[in-house]
Structures are given as structure tokens and as C-alpha cells.
UniProtKB/Swiss-Prot annotation:
Claim: Disulfide bond is one of the keywords in the record: yes
A GO term from the CC aspect: endoplasmic reticulum membrane
Family: Belongs to the SelWTH family. SELT subfamily.
SUPFAM superfamilies referenced in this protein's UniProt entry, alphabetically: Thioredoxin-like
Example GO BP: cell redox homeostasis
Name this polypeptide is given: Putative esophageal gland cell secretory protein 6
PANTHER family cross-referenced by the UniProt entry: SELENOPROTEIN T, THIOREDOXIN REDUCTASE-LIKE SELENOPROTEIN T
Keywords for the protein's UniProt record, in alphabetical order: Disulfide bond, Redox-active center, Signal
Organism: Heterodera glycines
Pfam families associated with the record: Rdx
Signal sequence bounds: 1-22
Amino acid sequence: MDRRFTVFLVIALVTSIYEVLSNGNLNDGDDSFKQFDELEENPAHKYSKEAQKGFEMEEEEVTIREPSGTKESFKLPINMPPVKFSFCVSCGYRQAYEQFAQILREKYPGIDIHGENYPPGILRTVGAQVIGMVKIALIVCVVSGRSPFPTLGLETPTFFQWMLSNRLSAALMLFLFSNAIEGMLQSTGAFEIYIESERIWSKLESGRVPSPPELFQAIDSHLAIRRGGAGRFGSSSSFGIDGS
């Protein structure tokens, strides 16, 4: 096998290994999501006793509830601001967002919740787009059996000649190799939570996602501040971000 092609394969292997390691680092905070993994199997241990009263009563099929001074849900103010989640889609955080949205709607009926992808930097975005276009162009050339190098006045490299002789394997290798690079450029590891334009939690700064009680407290704190009751709660720095 040609030396240059061997070098190419080594680079592809190293890049793939780097991607695996990078994804592992980005998913270090995934342990924080494990509190939702058994939500359907054993929800009684995921929240406080007050928040779980409704779940327990439904499981026991009790039709008559005993009087309790604790309400199961929070009555939203008329001007309740929307809650926005900005997360890394390529990191697999969409399911976590959907689980957070579900428990928020259960505690705050009628709350407006939005989710969107946390955009990477401009350079990363442009780089991923360029790699995507180059990937498509190279795969088309390989599948069609045509070399673009003579058109550019260049001699076709040996490794590209091998790719033309092994079209299926080369196209698959190009696809996987370019996708690995695109994934590295687009992955941010973000899971940010906002109320209106104010960020109440940042995984990028805290290194983890909030537990449901922490998120409830952050929202209640924000609502209390809007009502002028900030003195009863901690600042936003208690919820994973600095007060600045």
C-alpha cells in the first residue's frame, strides 16, 4: 500500500479516536441526566414529597384525596415569562430538554417553553459547512469515477487513484471521516436555561445540568424577584452561573 495512503488512513484513525474522546468529555455532564432515565419506572424518588404527591395518588388509584396545605402545582402569574432552553443537539441533549419541559409543565401548568440548538461559534459553523460541501463534492467524484485534479492542472494523487479503484469503500470512508470532523466542530456541550433574556442556569459554566428541585427553585426565585421578594431567595449565582 502506498505510503501516502497509509498516512491518510492513520490521520483518519487518529481523528476518529479524538472524536470519541471529545464526545466523552462533552458527555461528562450526562450523569446529571441519569435522574430522568428511570422516570417512568420509579418517579417517586425523583422529586420532593410535595411534588410527587400527585404521582403517588395516581399509582394507588385513590379517588379521594386527603386535605393538604401543599399545592401540587404553582399558579402562574398573568405575566409569566417564557422559559427557553438552548442546548447542544449534536450532543444528544434533546431528550433531556423534552424531559425537563414535561416536568415543568406538570409543576407550572400553562407555562410557555421553547427549545433550540445552541449555536457554535461563527468559525466552527463556517468550517462545518465547508467540510460538508467538500465531502459531497469528493463523494460525487469518487462514485462517478472522475478525478477533479486534471481539471485543476494537477496530477491525480496516488491515494485518490486508490479511491477511484475502490469506490464503495472510499465513499464510506469519506462520509464517516468528514462527519466526525463536522460533529467535533458543531458540538458545544451547552445546556443553557433562560427566563426571557435572563440566564438562570449554564452547563457551560457550572459543568452540569440542574436537578428538577434546583430548576424549580431558580424559576421561583426569578418570579419572586419580579414580585419584589428577592430578599427571600438567593441570587442567580446559586444556580450555576455568576451574578454578572
